[in-house]
Amino acid sequence: MITLIGEKLARKGSMFLFCGPAEKCRDCRFQPTCIAPLEEGRVYHINEVKDRYQRCPIHLGERVRVVDVEKANIEVLIDSKRAFEGSVISFEFPDCDVECSMRDLCFPEGVMEGDRCRIVKNLGKPGKQCPAGNELRRVLLRPLDKK
């Protein structure tokens, strides 16, 4: 999908988390191209940076670049019984209140409860045991578009 991003951030292969539009964006003439295609709370991967520029008051008078993006693959921890490459799952956050070093992978940014996701790659066991006793696997998920 095509969107706009600050010139300093527009690098092929980089990723960004869309946190929602600034107040000034709501009435901007570029809003349909810039923010309308993006979902708040999603992580996007920049596939291509185009040679097109626009001025943007949000980026301190700097320019924004036209970029081609897609939803990024997200590294997560899931139950080992569901970790089959190529399968489509409904993502669920674990029922866990334990604060541990792996919590960011169990509750990752960019994927939401109930999202349909494809398991792109099974990365194997995490480096540590789950303190809550869950049998987990590290996987790369790709959130799928809603149908």
Curated annotation (Swiss-Prot):
UniProt cross-references to InterPro entries, sorted A to Z: UPF0179
Domain of life the protein comes from: Archaea
UniProt record similarity statement: Belongs to the UPF0179 family.
Protein name, UniProt field: UPF0179 protein MTH_609
Protein source organism: Methanothermobacter thermautotrophicus (strain ATCC 29096 / DSM 1053 / JCM 10044 / NBRC 100330 / Delta H)
